Amino acid sequence: MTTKIYKFIPLTLLALFVFAPSLVLAHQPRITESRQTQVPSPEISKAYYSKLTGESDVYVIQASEPFDLYVNILVPDIAGQKKDVSAVVIKDGNVEKPLAVLDGIHFEWKKFYEPFGADSYWMGPEYKARAVAGMYEIRVSSPNNDSKYSLAIGEIEAFDGKEGLNALTVIPELKKNFFEVSPISFIKSPFGWGLIVVMYILAFIVGFIYRAILKKFAKNSPRGVTKNIGKPDRLIRTAIGVALLLLAISTSWSPILIFFSGFAFFEAIFSWCGFYAAMGKNTCPVE
């Protein structure tokens, strides 16, 4: 069943794009894992999240043809965060004559709310230009090289099912480590509550299909009954549904956990357990 659920996830994400239009305005989130990062497809909008650790971070673009270059610095709107992050755009290693200097120290940062992740930022300096082919470096730093930042590169929004899956992995980690809040806060995002709604709908659909199949092939046996669990079992399933949902939204926002939470609620609401049905077990009077 788990494999089948994973096959449904891209469709789930597509449904989220239909019901939550603000998703198409999102950058592809990335967590920077080293001091030097290669940036593929620089025109595609991406947001790199990192914290300076004593040295500058460098983002490298290798362009074989002209492209539209866009760079923007942001920092999280959290207590104690300094608005002192700057960046230098360099072409072909020409440090003496940089293309642009994004001076965050003397810039008037503006507050910015991003609905995709339901997060608040301070938006800093940006740079936009038509760039020729060549190698570009974006060097990010702060006076003490100890600040958190998000570096947005590219303006073309491209957010498909694959990127949706990546976002589900990245955003809970960003909530905890970058914005220093509980992953539960992601529920304020249309992507967050939309994921719960769609996975619950999917769980109910699977439940109805499974029940219909068992009833069709087991009309004259306990497996074919409409109800097969009593009140105590329904309460247990309700508790399981709540527990799985809380576990999911407070940790990784796993679609699988949310799906099984929805399935537990399905069993509780309709007094029917698929496992009991398969075994021919019944804990409530048959009407």
What kind of region is each of these model predictions?
Residues 69-112:
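Mid-chain, structured segments of secreted extracytoplasmic proteins
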Residues 213-287:
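Membrane-interfacial helix-loop segments of redox and metal-homeostasis proteins
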Residues 15-23, 209-210, 265-274:
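Hydrophobic membrane-targeting signal helices
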Residues 110-131:
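Beta-sandwich interaction modules
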Residues 8-11, 16, 190, 194, ...:
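Small-residue packing motifs within transmembrane alpha-helices
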Residues 58-79, 136-142:
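Hydrophobic beta-strand segments within beta-rich accessory/binding domains
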Residues 27-36, 59, 85-93, 127-203, ...:
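C-terminal edge strands of extracellular/lumenal beta-sandwich accessory domains
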Residues 1-67:
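N-terminal pre-first-transmembrane soluble regions of secretory-pathway and organelle membrane proteins
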